[in-house]
A protein has these predicted regions:
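Short amphipathic alpha-helix segments
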Residues: 106-113
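Acidic, low-complexity, intrinsically disordered interaction modules
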Residues: 46, 67, 71-72, 97-100, ...
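C-terminal alpha-helical interaction appendages
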Residues: 4-67, 71-101
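Short linear loop/turn motifs
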Residues: 74-79, 126-127, 158
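Short intrinsically disordered terminal tails
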Residues: 1-2, 96-101, 151-158
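Generic recognition of long tandem-repeat/solenoid scaffolds
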Residues: 91-93, 104, 129-131
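Detector for the mature cores of small, proteolytically processed
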Residues: 32, 39, 44, 145-147, ...
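Short secondary-structure junctions
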Residues: 23, 119, 152-154
Length: 158
């Protein structure tokens, strides 16, 4: 999978500004990014799940208008965004990873993410939800039971 690495949030914002994707306009702030996207123990794995939303505004500055794809994945591990992984790069994956959006329509998602978001690694191009394999059988069974309601998604432990 192609990816682009950024040294900091400013470089990410410049990339998103220079490469206008889709038609949804975003204002971006690291704090707000952190609050709406999934966090992993490797940093922050950001997935846009706004397919059903016409416009989502995230404040970056008053005038920095940024267009990004609806279905994009951005892995952010940066001290400007989170204390996890200080000094690590920001990675934008291309092409967009499809399928992860289904999770955000799931009933009981909040409880699921409260317990398991730290072990979600990401989503691959085949709609496989990638989960850290270092889990007990009880947790794996709980994850499988939750995800099996969503036929579009399979779970792979890696």
């Amino acid at each position: 999978m192609k990816h682009i690495t950024f040294k900091n949030v400013d470089e990410l914002v410049k990339y998103l500004t220079d490469n206008h994707f889709g038609e949804t306009k975003f204002f971006v702030t690291p704090d707000y990014i952190k609050s709406i996207f999934g966090i992993t123990d490797n940093g922050i794995l950001l997935y846009s799940y706004t397919d059903m939303v016409e416009e989502l505004y995230l404040e970056y500055t008053e005038n920095d208008e940024i267009e990004v794809p609806y279905t994009s994945a951005i892995e952010v591990i940066d001290s400007n965004v989170t204390d996890v992984g200080k000094g690590s790069p920001i990675v934008v994956y291309e092409p967009p990873i499809e399928g992860y959006n289904y999770l955000f329509e799931c009933e009981g998602l909040d409880e699921f993410l409260d317990k398991y978001e730290s072990v979600i690694i990401g989503m691959d191009s085949h709609d496989n939800l990638l989960i850290d394999d270092d889990l007990c059988d009880e947790d794996k069974n709980a994850i499988n039971a939750f995800i099996e309601n969503y036929k579009e998604i399979d779970v792979l432990y890696v």
